[in-house]
Amino acid sequence: MELRGIRGPMGGQDLKGQGLGFSITGSGIPASSIITAVQQQDYSASVWLRRRDKLEHSQQKCIVIFALVCCFAVLVALIFSAVDVWGEDEDGITEENCSKNCRVVLVENIPEDISFLDNSTSHLPLSAGLYNLLDQAMRVVEIASPLWFLNSSDYESSFQPAARQGRALLSRLQGLKAKGIQLKISSGLSGNSSELGILAKHNAEVHYVNMTALTKGHLLSSFWVVDRRHFYIGSASMDWRSLATRKELGVLVYNCSCLALDLHRVFGLYWGLQYKDFIPSFWSKRLFALFNRDTPLELTLNNTKAQAYFSSSPDVFLPRDRSSDLEAISRVIQEAHHFIYISIIDYLPLLSSTAHRYWSRIDGLIREALILRKVRVRLLISCWEKTHPLTFNFIWSLRSLCMEQANCSLEAKFFNPRVQRDGSLQGINHNRFMVTDRAIYLGELNDWTL
């Protein structure tokens, strides 16, 4: 066999020639096979490397996707935890199918020892109106009230005859269980209430709103919602004195599920705040207002076309689209053309009764109505032991505006309660309302101070 060796230059070796020469001579394996084997090894290595790169890239994608999913889950959890008050079922009542043809009845409580002229206007007694509202109930009665003192057993015996209406109403509420009617109560009373305890034993659900922790204030709302169809709203709380010795005013509205549903949403907000010591960051859609000052409900009241909406306070208790009490009061005053009549407990436009900082929001609007628009203003204010002395200064300041002004009219009267033999007061003017030639504001605003 002929041996052929291929040498390279003297300075080095040709690796290919060297391999070929010895492979041919030592093993007899074809050179092409060796080259193919090496190429296959190179290809396998490159394929493995490419697959490894793809695998690492896929793993990175999975990690990124997993991280995004985790972030989304945490975000959803935070949102759902922030929406802490969800509202309740609305029995299928919507803005589209609710009733707007409503009947309204004024109810009031006049203390027994107060007499009026024979030709004076009288309205349905408050106690009779509330009894009638309970007679309409078929499924659920929802009550928001700051106080629960319907039974006067803790007071002096001289009050017992006057408190019979309160005891009768408490008995009617206890009887709802036998009729299969659910009673739900939201109260601002943080301490123990024997009456609420009794009602709880009669199957009532009672929720407390800790307003001190939430706003450092008090719950003042007082209203009933019956079957999401009828409701009461006014100045009276669930206190036997509101049915006997105080001057109260409110309205009963029947077959008005549009407004009742909106008021039910206000109740739902209070109901969901039990045990809460913080204001939720987000409100559920079920708590959003259906109507407000810019888009009021167009309805019929006693066959008369009208507009209506509910307002609320404070601002932190306002879900989307809900108007504030201050906005509602301002709108009523600003839209008055001829007269403004106001009945309220206290008129004290101060930010604080101790710091004596002037609060001009409402007082300024009344002054504008008097001077700029020549609107006639009448004020009926309670005068009792808790009346702040500066109240008289502010009223005198308003009256002084009209001393040298033509067509400027302001009248102010103080409603004085009578002192009983035991030192208690009877006949306190507890009304809170405002009526003009164009609108009515009826609410539970305690006094016009901040």
Q: Which residues fall in each region the model found?
A:
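Charged, low-complexity intrinsically disordered terminal segments
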Residues: 2-450
